[in-house]
C-alpha cells in the first residue's frame, strides 16, 4: 500500500494501475461502515484508492471542523489490512491552493434537509468529490446510504457534468443496537450513546406504521417525531418523508419514499434514514 500526499504523485501512481479502479472517498477516522465500502470496492475492481481528507469547505463556521476526529496512523493500518493500493491523504493547501475559487452548485437536490440545515455543505461536498474524481480517474466510486442526500447530490453532479464514474451506494452499517456507524459517534458520552438509539427507534416506528398501511406523509413524519420527543436528550432538527428522486416532502406515499431525520443528542448532530417500500 502506498500513501501519497500530492496530486502530481497520485496521478503518476494512478497511471501505472492497469484494469479497473474503485475510489472510496473518506474524511478518515474510519469505522466498519467505511471498511464495508472498501471491501465492496476491492471485490468489484482490480485496484482500490481510498482518500482521507477532512474537507473544510463542507463545514459551516459553527460546525465541528477543528474537533472532527482524526487518527491517520490507525486509518492507514486498517486500510493496509484491506489491501488498498493507494491512499491519498493531502493537506488542505494541496486541494485548495491560494487563489482557488471554483465551486459546484448542484441545484435543487441540495436545497432541502441537510442543505437547509447546513448552508454551503453540499457546495463543498460536490466540489471536493469532483476534484477527487478528476485526480483519481476512478471507474467506480463508493458511498454509504447513511448520507442519502449526499449520494443524490453526487449522482446529479456526475450526470450533469458527464463524469465517467459509476456511483455505487452501499447499505448502512449499524451497531448491534441499531445506531448507524458514524465517526461523530465518538463525541457521545455513555448516557448520550444510549439516547442515540432514538434515531433507529424512530425509523423503526415509521417502518411499522408504513407496513401497517399508513400512507399519509404527515402521519408518518409524526410517528418519527413522537419517538424523538419522548427521548429527553434528543432534539429533532428535521424529520422527513420525501420523494426518493428529488426529496420533495410527500403528502401521500404511493410507492417508495425516503424517511430521514437529523437529531441532536447533546451537542452532537446525527443523521439516519431508511427507504419505505410497499
UniProtKB/Swiss-Prot annotation:
Protein's organism: Roseiflexus sp. (strain RS-1)
Active site feature: 34 (proton donor)
Localization terms from the record: Cytoplasm
InterPro entries named among the record's database cross-references: Cyt_trans-like, Pantoate_ligase, Pantoate_ligase_C, Rossmann-like_a/b/a_fold
Binding site for beta-alanine: 58
Its job: Catalyzes the condensation of pantoate with beta-alanine in an ATP-dependent reaction via a pantoyl-adenylate intermediate.
GO terms under cellular component: cytosol
Domain of life (superkingdom): Bacteria
Record GO terms (molecular function): ATP binding; pantoate-beta-alanine ligase activity
HAMAP family assigned: PanC
The organism's taxonomic lineage, starting at the top: Bacteria, Bacillati, Chloroflexota, Chloroflexia, Chloroflexales
Name assigned to this protein: Pantothenate synthetase
Underlying gene: panC
Family, similarity comment: Belongs to the pantothenate synthetase family.
EC number per UniProt: 6.3.2.1
Entry-linked SUPFAM superfamilies: Nucleotidylyl transferase
Quaternary structure note: Homodimer.
Reaction(s) the record says it catalyses: (R)-pantoate + beta-alanine + ATP = (R)-pantothenate + AMP + diphosphate + H(+)
Broad class of the protein's primary localization: cytoplasm
Amino acid at each position: 500500500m502506498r500513501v501519497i500526499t500530492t496530486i502530481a504523485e497520485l496521478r503518476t501512481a494512478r497511471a501505472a494501475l492497469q484494469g479497473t479502479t474503485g475510489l472510496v472517498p473518506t474524511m478518515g477516522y474510519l469505522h466498519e461502515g467505511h471498511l464495508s465500502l472498501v471491501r465492496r470496492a476491492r471485490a468489484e475492481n482490480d485496484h482500490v484508492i481510498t482518500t482521507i481528507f477532512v474537507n473544510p469547505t463542507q463545514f459551516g463556521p459553527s460546525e465541528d471542523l477543528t474537533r472532527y476526529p482524526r487518527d491517520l496512523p490507525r486509518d492507514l493500518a486498517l486500510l493496509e489490512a484491506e489491501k488498498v493500493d493507494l491512499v491519498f491523504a493531502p493537506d488542505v493547501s494541496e486541494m485548495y491552493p491560494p487563489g482557488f475559487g471554483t465551486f459546484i452548485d448542484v441545484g435543487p437536490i441540495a436545497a432541502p434537509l441537510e442543505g437547509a440545515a447546513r448552508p454551503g455543505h453540499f457546495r463543498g461536498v460536490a466540489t471536493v468529490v469532483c476534484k477527487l474524481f478528476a485526480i483519481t480517474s476512478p471507474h467506480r466510486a463508493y458511498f454509504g446510504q447513511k448520507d442519502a442526500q449526499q449520494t443524490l447530490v453526487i449522482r446529479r453532479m456526475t450526470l450533469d457534468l458527464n463524469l465517467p464514474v459509476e456511483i455505487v451506494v452501499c447499505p448502512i452499517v449499524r451497531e448491534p443496537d441499531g445506531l448507524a456507524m458514524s465517526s461523530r459517534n465518538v463525541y457521545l458520552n455513555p448516557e448520550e450513546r444510549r439516547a442515540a438509539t432514538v434515531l433507529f427507534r424512530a425509523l423503526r416506528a415509521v417502518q411499522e406504521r408504513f407496513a401497517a398501511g399508513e400512507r399519509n406523509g404527515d402521519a408518518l413524519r409524526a410517528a418519527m417525531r413522537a419517538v424523538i420527543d419522548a427521548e429527553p436528550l434528543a432534539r429533532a432538527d428535521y424529520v422527513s418523508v420525501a420523494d426518493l428522486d428529488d426529496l420533495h416532502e410527500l403528502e401521500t406515499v404511493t410507492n417508495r419514499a425516503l424517511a430521514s431525520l437529523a437529531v441532536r443528542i447533546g451537542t452532537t448532530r446525527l443523521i439516519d434514514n431508511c427507504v419505505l417500500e410497499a
